[in-house]
Design a protein with these regions (language model features):
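Structural signal for hydrophobic packing residues in well-ordered secondary-structure cores
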Residues: 15, 29, 41-50, 81, ...
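Hydrophobic "anchor" residues on beta-strands that sit immediately upstream
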Residues: 22, 78, 107
Length: 140
């Protein structure tokens, strides 16, 4: 999962409830623990009422990390779901970084409410394809 904000963290909670292993990546924190932003996203799940975590222990199944330190995790990922800020340039830059890091069999999806898949996926080479999804309110 790329992006540990509201959408990314809640989608991660939904996925682990389905038995899907999730690595939740976000930017490295400027000070302190580098994966603090991803951990903050996970911690925030416990505070929501109702919590999107089906079981409290599901939080421990989401592994926090950073784009900078844990990018290698993408190499073996079956599915890469991007849920970063709704900004075309941010998404394009991120997908440009994803392309050389993934296997050709990875499923790439972007979560967006109004940006076109063609514009977002333009940095991807022809042998990689991305899918647009709109999960506007992750189930709790």
């Amino acid at each position: 999962m790329l992006g540990a904000g509201t959408m990314g963290a809640q989608l991660a909670a939904h996925l682990v409830a389905q038995g899907i292993e999730v690595v939740l990546l976000d930017m490295a924190a400027p000070a302190g623990e580098r994966s603090a932003l991803a951990r903050k996203g996970i911690d925030g799940l416990r505070k929501l009422k109702p919590s999107p975590l089906h079981l409290a222990e599901h939080a421990s199944l989401i592994r926090p990390g950073t784009f900078e330190d844990d990018w290698g995790e993408l190499k073996d990922a079956d599915w890469i779901l991007e849920a970063v800020v709704e900004d075309l340039e941010v998404k394009r830059q991120l997908w440009g970084r994803v392309a050389p890091a993934v296997s050709g069999s990875s499923v790439l999806t972007t979560n967006t409410s109004g940006l076109g898949i063609g514009a977002i996926s333009s940095p991807l080479p022809a042998d990689l394809q991305a899918v647009l999804d709109l999960l506007s309110d992750p189930p709790g």
